[in-house]
A protein has these predicted regions:
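N-terminal nucleotide/polyanion-binding subdomain common to many enzyme families
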Residues: 1-74, 202-218, 222-225
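Internal, active-site/partner-interface "lid" segment
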Residues: 143, 155-195
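Hydrophobic/aromatic beta-strand patches that form the interior of the parallel beta-sheet core
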Residues: 4-6, 34-36, 85, 108-109, ...
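Charged, low-complexity interaction regions
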Residues: 260-270, 282-294
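Amphipathic, heptad-repeat alpha-helical segments
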Residues: 249-276
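S-adenosyl-L-methionine/SAH cofactor-binding core of RNA-modifying enzymes
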Residues: 63-114, 119, 157
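C-terminal accessory regions appended to core domains
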Residues: 208-251
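Structured adenosyl-cofactor binding patch, chiefly the S-adenosyl-L-methionine
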Residues: 118, 122-169
Length: 307
C-alpha cells in the first residue's frame, strides 16, 4: 500500500514513520510513505503558500493553487486519482472501521493543513474527504495523518509479524482487547490468571473473549451497541448487565413479541418462537448485531401498529 502525504513539513512525517512497525514495513516494501512538499508547487521565489483570508480574520489560509498542483502532479505520476483525506477537526472522527475501509486502497493521499486551513476551492476541486483525529485542535494535520497511517498500516498484509495480531486488538470486533500478562508468574503478590497457564486453548480463548466484553462494558459501553457477539456471548453480557438492572436480550425479546403478536392474532406465539429461532441463528453466526435486530423489530412493530 502506498501513502502519499501532501504537507509543508515533509521531514516531520517521513522521519516519524521510519521507526518501529511502520519503519520495518517500509523497508520490507509492504507499504511506502512519500511526503510531497506543497511548497515545491509555488511560483514565487519566496515559496509562499499562504495569504490573508478574504473577509478578514485571524491567521493565514493556504492558497488553492499549490495544493491543487501538487495533487494533479501526483495523479499524473500514478495514472489515476486516488482518494484524498484532509485532516481537519470538521471531519468524521477516525476509528477502526474507517481504517479497515481505507486499508483496501492501493494508494491513499493525506492532505495536511496548517495555519487557519486550506482554501475551500482546493478541497472541492480535489474532492477531499474530511477526517478528524478527535474533537480538539492541533497546529497542523501532520500528527493526525501519522496516527492514521500507523493504524491503517497494521491492517495491510505482511506488516505485522503475527497474522492474527490485528484481529484481536482493541476495536477490531467493536470490543476492547483482553488483559495481557507475561513473566513472572507472580508479581507483587498478584498472580497470572490460572486459565492462561492451563494450556487449554479453547478455555483461554473463551476467557479472553469474556474479558474483552467485561472490559468494554466497564470502559467503553458505547461500543457494545454495534459489537458482534454470539448468543452465548450475549447471555454473558446480560449476566453482567443484570448486576446493573439491565438486560439487552430481554429488550430484544419484547420487541420481537410486540412485532409479531396481538391478542386477536391466532398463532402469534408460534410466529414469535420462529422469529426468535431466526434471531438466535443470526446472532450465533454473527450475521447481525443485537442493535441491528432491535432496530429491525422496533420498526416492524411500529409499522404493524400503523396498519
Amino acid at each position: 500500500m502506498n501513502f502519499h502525504i501532501l504537507t509543508l513539513f515533509p521531514d516531520m512525517v517521513e522521519n516519524g514513520l521510519k521507526t518501529s512497525i511502520t519503519g520495518r514495513a517500509i523497508e520490507s516494501g509492504a507499504i511506502s510513505v512519500v511526503a510531497v512538499d506543497i511548497r515545491d508547487y509555488t511560483t514565487d521565489k519566496h515559496r509562499h503558500v499562504d495569504d490573508a483570508p478574504y473577509g478578514g480574520g485571524a491567521g493565514m489560509v493556504i492558497q488553492p493553487a499549490p495544493v491543487c498542483d501538487a495533487y494533479e502532479a501526483l495523479c499524473k505520476k500514478l495514472g489515476k486519482r486516488p482518494r484524498v483525506i484532509y485532516m481537519t477537526p470538521q471531519g468524521r472522527v477516525f476509528n477502526q472501521s474507517i481504517a479497515q475501509d481505507l486499508a483496501k486502497e492501493e494508494d491513499l493521499v493525506f492532505l495536511c493543513g496548517h495555519y487557519e486551513g486550506i482554501d475551500e476551492r482546493a478541497l472541492e476541486l480535489i474532492q477531499a474527504e474530511y477526517l478528524s483525529a478527535g474533537d480538539f485542535v492541533l497546529t497542523g494535520g501532520e500528527l493526525p495523518s501519522m496516527v492514521m497511517i500507523d493504524c491503517i498500516s497494521r491492517l495491510v498484509p505482511g506488516v505485522l509479524g503475527n497474522g492474527d495480531s490485528a484481529e484481536v486488538e482493541s476495536f477490531y470486533d467493536n470490543l476492547l482487547e483482553y488483559p495481557q500478562y507475561t513473566r513472572p508468574e507472580v508479581y507483587e503478590g498478584k498472580p497470572v490468571p490460572e486459565v492462561l497457564l492451563s494450556g487449554h486453548h479453547k478455555n483461554i480463548e473463551s476467557w479472553r473473549r469474556e474479558q474483552s466484553i467485561r472490559r468494554t462494558l466497564e470502559r467503553r459501553p458505547d461500543l457494545l451497541e454495534d459489537a458482534s457477539l454470539t448468543l452465548k456471548e450475549q447471555k454473558f453480557l446480560d449476566s453482567l448487565l443484570k448486576e446493573q438492572g439491565e438486560s439487552r436480550l430481554k429488550e430484544l425479546e419484547q420487541l420481537v413479541r410486540e412485532a409479531v403478536k396481538s391478542d386477536e392474532t391466532p398463532g402469534s406465539d408460534r410466529e414469535y418462537y420462529q422469529q426468535m429461532k431466526k434471531v438466535k441463528k443470526l446472532l450465533n453466526e454473527k450475521k447481525a448485531t443485537l442493535q441491528e435486530l432491535k432496530g429491525y423489530y422496533k420498526v416492524l412493530g411500529a409499522l404493524k401498529q400503523e396498519i
